[in-house]
Regions:
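General marker for long, soluble alpha-helical cores
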Residues: 2-203
Length: 203
């Protein structure tokens, strides 16, 4: 059994050694088995594996780049070791959907923020209203939902308002109220709700 494993490893090294652009000894010194597998799969499918054959990419990141190359995507948008795996996936999904990933292919956005921007782009929403890293992904999500409902979000699409406050402002606007009395991020959502209900009784 041990001999079979050794023979397999040796054969595997021989196969990888046929690959250009690499020094044999350096290749096996810098990459682990999973990374080598991704490099070899790129070689086997005639992809430019040199794009992701860098020790700073773990095998999962290499895989995302390899998948992108296979689909003929512009992987330069996410072939950056500073991106986390989830961020890479969101950028790749955007490229697959043919949206303008320049809106969110930025290190400062978390994968969840990227997802909210991507989903907005896929629905042709005005993502400029929330494509700001100062928003949490939950704030982005709420603004996106409101935009899908054709709501005017300009009064509350601000990082200073949390989601609960945004909801109270939206509820007031839906009722045709002048929300100015509680349009202030220093007023907590419970107080906003009290003011809103009071305004409703006076309407």
């Amino acid at each position: 059994m041990k001999n079979n494993v050794i023979q397999y490893k040796y054969k595997e090294k021989q196969e990888v050694n046929k690959m250009p652009k690499f020094d044999f000894n350096e290749l096996f010194k810098n990459f682990n088995h999973e990374q080598l597998t991704e490099i070899y799969l790129g070689y086997e499918t005639n992809l430019d594996y040199s794009i992701y054959s860098k020790p700073e990419y773990n095998h999962e990141k290499m895989q995302q780049i390899r998948f992108g190359l296979y689909k003929k995507l512009d992987v330069s948008w996410y072939a950056n070791s500073e991106f986390g795996l989830g961020q890479m996936k969101q950028i790749k999904k955007g490229l697959e959907s043919n949206v303008d990933v320049s809106w969110y292919a930025k290190i400062e956005f978390s994968e969840f923020q990227m997802e909210e921007i991507r989903l907005g782009l896929q629905k042709n929403l005005n993502v400029s209203l929330y494509a700001n890293s100062k928003f949490t992904w939950k704030q982005m999500q709420f603004i996106r939902y409101c935009l899908e409902q054709k709501s005017d979000v300009t009064l509350y699409a601000k990082p200073d308002f949390d989601v609960s406050q945004m909801k109270q402002i939206k509820l007031g606007l839906n009722k045709g109220l002048d929300v100015t009395p509680y349009l202030n991020p220093s007023i907590n959502w419970e107080e906003m709700e009290r003011i809103r209900k009071e305004l409703e009784t006076k309407k």
